[in-house]
Amino acid sequence: MVASVVRLKVTLDHVEPIVMRRVVVPFTIRLSRLHEVLQAAMGWTNSHLYEFRMRDVGFGLPDEEWGDGPIDARRVSLLSAVQDTGAKSFKYLYDFGDGWEHSIKIERTFPAVGTEGPMLLEATGHCPPEDVGGPWGYQEFCEALADPAHERHAETLEWCGSSDYDSAAANFSQLNKAVDDLAAKWARKARRKT
């Protein structure tokens, strides 16, 4: 089989302005590593649990205390999950408390040429801060930050730590560096194994 890469469009659901990323990853990437790519590309801090949902099948980190949980994402590739479920699009849930749901669409598959590491192609919109309270908390956060007369403006500004937060602007260079750093880390590990 010829190695291939896949372009994914990742959209954070239930937020405005739109938060979207386009990434390229090896089709054989383990879902646990895809989670890491999404964390870097979105700007999340990998502080919470996650789960991929393909049709009615969940992939994440199993918890023995919960019995029937998700299939172990560390043992399943994106390719095998897609083949097994027939999914062409799927969901990625991050932070079960805040409930950040992402819609992921497989846009295109290409033969791998050269590097097979993850790449960030496009970034639109600023990822919400961690622990802001999900889509509804984020909406309130943006309203309070934008309005100096808002009763929670000062508190939100202090919590955010920045007065120049722009929900519409993605810091592409910072996000791209985070994805590139992952690719470099994984390449070093692969070289050490050979």
Curated annotation (Swiss-Prot):
Keywords: Plasmid
InterPro entries recorded: MM3350-like_sf (IPR024047), Plasmid_pRiA4b_Orf3-like (IPR012912)
Record family assignment: To A.rhizogenes plasmid pRia4B ORF-3 in virA region.
Name of the protein described by the UniProt record: Uncharacterized protein y4hQ
Organism the protein comes from: Sinorhizobium fredii (strain NBRC 101917 / NGR234)
